[in-house]
A protein has these predicted regions:
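Class I SAM-dependent methyltransferase Rossmann-like catalytic core
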Residues: 1-41
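Conserved class I S-adenosyl-L-methionine
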Residues: 41-51
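Glycine-centered, small-residue-biased loops immediately flanking beta-strands
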Residues: 43, 70, 152
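Conserved SAM-binding loop of SAM-dependent methyltransferases across substrates and taxa
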Residues: 52-66
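Conserved SAM-binding motif I beta-strand of class I
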Residues: 68-76
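S-adenosyl-L-methionine
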Residues: 77-121
C-alpha cells in the first residue's frame, strides 16, 4: 500500500511533541545544521519569525552544551510559547523591519548567524504566495547585509517560484557560498525550500 503523503508530517509532529518542541519545523533546522555545520561556539544568533519558538528552543538547548558566551536574539510579531527566562536569550516582539527593532538589533549585533523560518500569510494562490515570499526573502537578505558579521551565515525559508534565480543572485552579491536545500522534514507536496548562504563578504 502506498504511504500517505501526510505520514511523514505526522511522524515529525509527534516527534516534536515528544521532545518538547512547539512545532515540527525544528527538524528542518536540525537537518540543515547537521549538513552545513552552521552552529558553533560563542555565536551571536538572530532568529527571525521565531514564533512559536521551536528553532529558538533548539538553539538554546545547543547553547547549554557549549558553556560559553553564545547569545540568541529572537524576533516575531507574535509571542513565543517557550520560556524566555534565559540570560543569553533576548526576545523582541515587533516588526523585524521597523526602525525600533532595527535599533535594538544594532545593540545586540552584529550576528554570526541569522535564521529565518518566516513566511508570509498564504492565500492558496501559488503566484501570490511565492511573490510575497520572495519579497520577504529580499528584505531578509538586505537585513543580513546590515547585521551579519563578515564570514557570517544565513538560513532563510522561501517558496519556490519564478523569482528564485533573482534571489540567488542577490545572495551571491553578499555571500561567497550560496545553496538551496530542502530538508526531509518538509512536506513532500510543499514548495518551500531553504536558502543557505555562507561566508558573508
Amino acid at each position: 500500500m502506498a504511504k500517505s503523503s501526510y505520514e511523514k508530517p505526522d511522524f515529525w509532529t509527534q516527534k516534536a511533541k515528544k521532545e518538547g518542541y512547539p512545532a515540527r519545523s525544528i527538524y528542518k533546522l536540525e537537518e540543515i545544521n547537521e549538513k552545513f555545520r552552521l552552529l558553533k561556539k560563542n555565536m551571536h544568533i538572530l532568529d527571525i519569525g521565531a514564533a512559536p519558538g521551536s528553532w529558538s528552543l533548539w538553539v538554546l538547548r545547543k547553547f547549554k552544551s557549549f558553556h560559553d558566551q553564545s547569545m540568541l536574539v529572537s524576533v516575531d510579531l507574535s509571542d513565543l510559547t517557550i520560556p524566555k527566562d534565559k540570560p543569553n536569550f533576548h526576545f523582541i516582539q515587533g516588526d523585524i523591519f521597523s526602525d525600533v527593532v532595527q535599533k535594538q538589533l544594532i545593540t545586540y549585533g552584529p550576528f554570526d548567524l541569522i535564521l529565518s523560518d518566516a513566511a508570509p500569510a498564504t492565500t492558496g494562490n501559488s503566484t501570490v504566495d511565492t511573490s510575497r515570499s520572495e519579497e520577504l526573502v529580499r528584505c531578509v537578505l538586505d537585513l543580513s547585509a546590515e547585521h551579519l558579521k563578515t564570514g557570517g551565515a544565513l538560513v532563510c525559508k522561501f517558496f519556490i517560484g519564478g523569482g528564485q534565480q533573482e534571489l540567488l543572485s542577490q545572495a551571491k552579491s553578499t555571500f561567497k557560498t550560496v545553496r538551496t536545500y530542502k530538508p526531509e522534514a518538509c512536506r513532500t507536496s510543499s514548495f518551500e525550500t531553504y536558502l543557505i548562504a555562507q561566508q558573508k563578504l
